[in-house]
Structure formats: structure tokens, C-alpha cells
Amino acid sequence: GLAESIRAADSIHPIATHHMGGQAMAFPNDPNIRVFGQQTTKNTPEAMHDDAGKQGWGNWVYVMAEAHPWHKDLIDAELNNAAGRAPMRRSQWATAMAGGYVMMYDAFESGDPTDAMFDDLRRLKLFMEGTPFNRMAPLFDDALTTAKLDGTKYVLSNPAQGLYILYGDVNTGKLGVRNAPVGNYSLRWFDPVTGVTVNQSGSVVAGGLASFTKPAGVGPEA
């Protein structure tokens, strides 16, 4: 096939696919294609994380390339009445917490995203780059419901290594997770809206309930 021919001529660069027919990877068994740029028609952060995330996840790099027309509508809403930034940011975090990379779709059109929207995406990028996210996996469905505690909405985790990224989107007073290994933890609180970071320490005792109160200075998203 085409990907095989490209790989024969270029052994270095990753080969990606982006297709408009369906959200699931169309070439899951092609060893030459290792990047999937997904296009979805979902229009809520929850659906982006759940359905789009589960279909995008696999033995390849997962990139949320388009959420059309929702993301375009959010850009227009932000430009018209400052109503699109928050749902766009939550959508991007939902994708990241599903194991995906994020593109700012429609950035090349006449109605460009605002600087604040780009700043939100950069904060997400910098946060993830400061974590070992590549050693964690997203939780979905019953596994997510069983694990999350307090204001936690999405979870990336590697319990065997005691690694967790927890995200809460609205009025987050605490973040927590069940069945965490007993021990002492380094906590890094992060505000996706402002970039404020607070470092703390915490511990988990027998029973595995890890529940931590959000510190002052971090807003309702954390």
C-alpha cells in the first residue's frame, strides 16, 4: 500500500493518516502508520473524552485533529460574545485525558482563535510536558467510574508506579482516586485557566482512598 511505499523510501519520519469516514482508526493493523489524526462530530467535552477517545486510542499516536463543526462554532462564539473559550479548553483537556494530542482546529481560517484560547492550549502542553504522561493510560467506562473520587472527572494513571493525573472541570474542591498504592505522594496542583501551580505533599493509607483538598490560588478547574 501507499504507507508501505512511503516507509520504504523514508525510514525516519512518522506516517500519519487522517480520514473523514468514521472516528475509529481505519488501518489499525498497518505497521507503517503510527499516527492517527481523528475527526469527530462530537460536541461536548464528555463525548470527546469518551467516544472519540476510546475510538482514537490504540497502538499509535492519537491526535484530535478536528471536532467539526463544534470547535469552529466555539471559536465564533468566543469572537462574538466571549462564550467559547471555556468549553474549548475543557474539550482539549478531555482529549488529553483520553490519551490524545490536541490541534487547534480552524486556526488557519479567517475567524482565528483568540490569543487566550491559544494560551489555554499552551498551558495544557506545558503541563503535560512536565509529567510522565507517556507512562500512563486513560480510564474509561466502569474503570473510570470505579476509580474517580471527589471532583475528579478524568484519570490518567499508572497505579503500579504510583502515577496519576486527575482533572476536574467545574467547582473542583477536591481531587481524588480510589485504590491508590499506599505511600507518600508529591502533588502538583495546576490551574488550566491561569497556569498557577502549587506543589504539596500528601499520603495514602491503607484502603487506598487518595483524597486531596485543592489549595488556595487554584480556580474551579484543576
Language-model features, listed with the residues they occupy:
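Aromatic- and carboxylate-lined catalytic core of secreted/periplasmic carbohydrate-active enzymes
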Residues: 61, 70-73, 84-202, 209-222
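Extracellular glycoside hydrolase catalytic/binding regions
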Residues: 1-116
